[in-house]
Amino acid sequence: GQQDLADRCLVFLHRESVSDDPTRVIRASRYAARLGFVLSPEALQQVTATVRRWPWAWHWNDAPEQAPPALASRLRMELDRLFAVEPWAVALDCLEEWQAMALLDSSLQHDRDRNRRIAWAQRLGLPLLPAWLVVAPNPEAVARRLGVPGQQQQWLKQLLRLREWLLSVDVPDVHAAPDVWTAALETQGWMPETVAFMVCLQP
């Protein structure tokens, strides 16, 4: 109501708003970032309690393709808007504060390098959503559930193999000349975007 606007508070319409449609949490983070609003105490309690309770039929060990749209394609659409038009760092800070990262993957809840990594992706012209997801244990599965474009899914899938290769005995010495590294990367057939995401992961 008018008083909530005056208090710069975001309020859900009813007590089951989040369980009915979890995309409302992402939308709330967008409005909070853009307008400088905060969740009301009741709304915050609803978000944290609902995500902790996980009332939805789909669970993490289920096939990504079986997730309902509100935990999949519609969630991605809200995230696409978040990264395209909102102060994304503020919006993601809100989601972290609300303990809502588990809507994507619980590992994202404690991601201290998030803003630095996504800022690097922005500078390199990479899509920001997969740059956020790269630290998940299986980022390609999260991307598949969200319906991220297939080429971006391939980058994330290849990133897991690139990580393994970098830990193997077959990689050049860390102090090798750039042309040695370039030749090694090209020989392995890594896509340029995959290598760029790996660069974003470096401290």
Question: What are the functions of these language-model segments?
Answer:
Residues G1-L146:
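Glycine- and charge-enriched loop/helix tracts that form the active or gating conduit
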